[in-house]
């Protein structure tokens, strides 16, 4: 291969973004190839949907596999390029020979005689070009790790923003349901109601401030991550000798980035005790509200759609990270009028659905949770985070998850369903009044985990 052909070949191994030999190259949908870090930095600058920097076509796939062949060729091209290893700084003072070897144990450049000395004889040594490529591989892994932290922080920041707006809406809803519940009480509790509303307002303001502070911390952390990522990326492109002399503290920096990663706020409001509420509810208590017959089922609590599958169908349910093998228990009777109250122990499971729904107990009556004539309080656990919500429409409940008995109150004639934390004597949530058109039966579904 003559020099012109060699130059053409080498040009095919150069990323058009950073104008350096490819490092961790990926080939996107249109067929053009780039360094993965270059694409990451482009996407971080807001170029979404991602367009090819060469032909401007939109790339549908967010993640790409490394082009292994291109990676190997680029590595070979780097190792064959001229290296300024004969500079005075790279001459061994003791033996006056060029340092052409790298000691992995001591992270030092050595000349031949030094590598054979008693101090280094037992260590592993490799040529500078090969060692530099190994170092770049380690840098790429550290960059991948940094990018994971970056993406996790960005997701947390987006979630924090959604939580801020969601909490604002929830506080307004909670004020209304507290006021409605006090209006139902047989005794006048105006002062207690005002204390609860004022306490709710104070707690909410504190949580809003925490969420705003958290968003600032996450934004600052993202900027630090981006700077660190870019710094490592630039380090990958420095000459081999300089690279090997600057490799010591990379892991320490990325470990520090992980330790300094801001954690999202988990907002939780206090549900205050309402004087006499349990005494009032117990006037309508239903004994043995739930049947003793348990039906195997599968519950999915994903963000897209929440559903329950009964009988053998649950064995073929699609794989779902938020799916839980469960058991369902229906009420012993359906209600068509009157007021009814019962309590259910939720101690044994983190994932459960409790409430009332249309009277449909056949094994093939699979249903979507967020649909009409279903009024549920839902507890779910994802990773180490517990969430409490209601359905129709889906609404996160920013109050502490009940750990013992949960009370369910159905006022059929007035079209209302409410949930209470029995241990606290407090209101969890009350659905807005509606008009029921069919018999309603108690329902409880609890996960096996």
Curated annotation (Swiss-Prot):
A zinc finger (RING-type) spans 15-56. Residues 269-449 form the B30.2/SPRY domain. The keyword Zinc applies. Zn(2+) binds at residues 92, 95, 114, 120. Disulfide bonds: none annotated. Pfam families: SPRY, zf-B_box, zf-C3HC4. Belongs to the TRIM/RBCC family. This is Tripartite motif-containing protein 64. It comes from Homo sapiens. The gene is TRIM64.
